[in-house]
Amino acid sequence: TNPTSSTMFKSLISVKSRNPIIFGFHPGAQKCSAAAAKIVLDAAVAAGAPENCIQWIEYPSIEATNALMNHPGVATVLATGGSGMVKAAYSTGKPALGVGPGNVPCYIHKSADLEQAVNDLILSKTFDNGMICASEQAAIVDKAIATKFEKLMKKYGCYFAKPDEIKKLSDYCIDSEKGAVNPVIVGKPATWIAEQAGVKVPEGTKILLAKLDGVGPEYPLSREKLSPVLAYFIVDSTEEGIDRAEEMVMFHGMGHSAVIHANDEDVIQKYAATMKASRLIVNSPSSHGAIGDIYNTNMPSLTLGCGSYGGNSVSGNVTTVNLINQKRVAKRRVNMQWFK
């Protein structure tokens, strides 16, 4: 998940909290991740940091990562990746800050500012070509505004796949045996993905949308896709929209994030109360809203906890304070006398 930005962020919060950090990168992102780590390392050393404050495994493997996590010199594990790796981190017996996958629904209610909602959706879904785990995975749109939504999306360079093209995209983008995204599409442009899947799209296409009838294993594109590929649902009512969003979150996105575009406060509150998500993003781009600070006052972070919903120890945005031990010297004082 967003390997370069995640590497830089973890390096920064570690150095800021006076902790050295050693990375075990995913083999598929080794080169770009190592390059990102070296940029931060060189800058840190130039500013006076210790020479080996940021390190990484040169030849990555599952065995090497497990050895690193279980090494007696490692105090805490920051686990970002698949559920298997996160579970392995929790099984080390060390404090572990694991984060989970997202399957983020974007419900666009009929009360929304549609122009802004479309702009936010495209901005978020194209950022880093959809690699951020908080990026929208499905647009859920009220029927009353669906036609206008489609016109605006097409106007700004998005492509709605035909039924036969949806099948091609499903077969190419999702590994049916593993029930997960095909790793080769992660972070790739929409035009490249379409070409590889055998779908002809206009030059400059930003996002590929696939209209689906449901959520679950029988609808492969309702999964997390980490690319500019977006599931699309039209719903007849607010209740159906919230239910469909809940289905998305429950389908391998528990505890992560959900976004809503609406100007009806009652709808926003009902949506927030229903979603089993740690971050509820309102009238903002999901990627940037979940990362925090730009569109809200959430703590800026690229390590997003999913809480007990997602099997994580934290539900917030992991940052420097999570890597600091606090000592509390408690001297005898006359405190409030609650009982005699």
Would you name each region that the model predicts?
Residues V15, A46-P50, L68-P72, L78, ...:
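Solvent-exposed alpha-helices and their adjacent loops that cap or buttress functional pockets
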Residues T1-L41, A47, A75, S83, ...:
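Conserved small-residue-rich beta-alpha loop and adjacent elements
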Residues Q55-V74:
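A structured beta-alpha segment of the ubiquitous adenosine-cofactor-binding alpha/beta core
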Residues V199-K340:
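Conserved C-terminal structural/oligomerization subdomain of aldehyde/semialdehyde dehydrogenase
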Residues L41-W56, R279-I281, S286, I291:
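A glycine-rich helix N-cap at a beta->alpha junction
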Residues P20-G24, L78, L97-V99, Y107, ...:
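Short hydrophobic alpha-helical runs that function as membrane-insertion/retention elements
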Residues M8-F9, I13-P20, V86-G216, W338-F339:
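ALDH superfamily catalytic-core signature
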Residues R18, I54, V77-L78, G102, ...:
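Buried hydrophobic positions in well-ordered alpha/beta secondary-structure cores of metabolic enzymes
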